[in-house]
From Swiss-Prot:
Any one GO biological process: lipid A biosynthetic process
Protein name, entry field: Lipid A acyltransferase PagP
Subcellular location(s) per record: Cell outer membrane
Example of a GO cellular component annotation carried by this entry: cell outer membrane
Organism field: Legionella pneumophila (strain Lens)
Family assignment from sequence similarity: Belongs to the lipid A palmitoyltransferase family.
Assembly and oligomerization: Homodimer.
Coiled coil: none
Domain of life of the source: Bacteria
Catalyses which reaction(s): a lipid A + a 1,2-diacyl-sn-glycero-3-phosphocholine = a hepta-acyl lipid A + a 2-acyl-sn-glycero-3-phosphocholine; a lipid IVA + a 1,2-diacyl-sn-glycero-3-phosphocholine = a lipid IVB + a 2-acyl-sn-glycero-3-phosphocholine; a lipid IIA + a 1,2-diacyl-sn-glycero-3-phosphocholine = a lipid IIB + a 2-acyl-sn-glycero-3-phosphocholine
Protein purpose: Transfers a fatty acid residue from the sn-1 position of a phospholipid to the N-linked hydroxyfatty acid chain on the proximal unit of lipid A or its precursors.
The keyword Transferase belongs to this UniProt entry's keyword annotation: yes
Amino acid sequence: MKRLISCLTIICALNASAAAETTSSPCSRWISFLKPVCQRIHQTWTEGHDDMYFSGYAWHNRYTYRPEKIKSYNEAAWGGGLGKSLFDEKGNWHGLYAIAFLDSHRHIEPAVGYAYLKTASVNKDIKAGLGYSVLITSRVDYDNVPFPGALPWVALFYKRTTVAATYIPGSAGAGNVLYILGKISL
């Protein structure tokens, strides 16, 4: 519960900081080479659609874990969250999110982040995307200390619904998890 409150506090602080900036130059205090990052995040936050995230599956790579270890892991990564997202002028997707889900040990793991996907349209209603996510998360097995991460991200968009996945790399017995989540744009 403390992690969820911390996550929500971070989001509120970022929102308050964004609200304090003037609308004519929301990123005026940023270092010049980071201004495009700030401007895209600001655009996503102010112009993006509201999203509801839900998660449900975390597949542990059978080639890197012993069968008895896999049996002890939770692969039902139930959870959810909220976000904002938009398709930019080139048709690529940008998203901000805050989620919490059950990790491999059935502990709640919160995460806040930004994701970018280069997309290709299959037809009017279907798009596929490939990109990355940068995030901050915390885990019980790391003493709940927040730490940053960057992960690959793929998604299939159909109208207002999305199925996405990321692969958390690792070594033998750690990481190597395919995490699948969904999103509905409200």
